Amino acid sequence: MDSNGRFHSDWCSMIYSRLMVARTLLTEDGAIFISIDDREVENLIKIGNEVFGESCFVGNISWQKTYSPRNDSKGIPAEKESIIVYGKNLEWMPKKLPRTAEMDAKYKNPDNDKMAWTSDNPCAPGARTHQGMVYAIQHPFTGEMLYPATSSCWRYDQSTMFDYMSGWCEYELKDIGDNVERAKICGIDASEVRKDVKAIVLKKSLEESKKNAEYVLKRGQWPRFYFTKNGKGGIRRKTYLENVDGRMVTNLWPFAEVGHTDEAKKELKALFNGEIPFDTPKPVRLMQRIVQIASEKDELVLDFFSGAATTAHAVMLQNTIDNGNRHFIMVQIPEKLDGKYANLCEVGKERIRRAGKKIKEESPLT
């Protein structure tokens, strides 16, 4: 039946009407996440583009829903499911995720600085449009003139860079007649390059400058821009852990981070004393991530296809984690079930009661 034209037409009409209502209910800074399999994902995006506007399309997330593909599957076994995301307005962006211990472990403190840091690129793109940030910096250990990479400029304006470099030894600004070199970096003719940009050069002799720089190197707490290979290498920039935000949300969500279908069934089984009253639940971690990146602590979360109320479970759990006060509305057709519960709505209501009780008992906030 799923493959006939009438079913497909009815599905499209149902989704279209639901999305129209959803768009009306969304706040201006809201977003919608729609889970769909491969068969209808293309049609869903077409409908979503019509309802929300193509410019409000945020992404197509691939959720790795299984850790063990079925051997008896016909064709290519499906390991992932799509989650289509639209914002109410084109400026909507997901919140960043908390950093992991593995990410933070990359930050070290070899020079006994005020905080841990990692080595980063001293340059930024945009040489042609930022010609005032393309100039030479003289190496305090070797005397070599250092320039940004091709098509790049230094990360900060010259005044800021001058202050950072002065942490190694005394510097001064000087015209060294390097317009040709600077023009090459900018990708323009020498006649077009900005002419009033001076180099940051050593104020004293290389011998004196090197002596001072070696003292700073041994002392520790190096300036923000430092030199690799014990002073003999190139220039790099410190990025401090304290100044780094969370990690960006990507369109690949592996089961190791957000759970899989077997995990979802085990969660239901644990709540319902060994029973699994619904065959296709979503894992709590999956819905919790959506709540985490798409809502503020005091917002309302609506699920149009709530199923076994995993979203409600996730909202309650996230509230305990970040001390939030989110509320939820679960919408579900009372689909009849075989077994203890008459319909799917009863399963959802019972899950909310049981999950809420469990979370309250285990929460450090209560």
Predicted regions and their residues:
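Class I S-adenosyl-L-methionine
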Residues: 1-300, 322
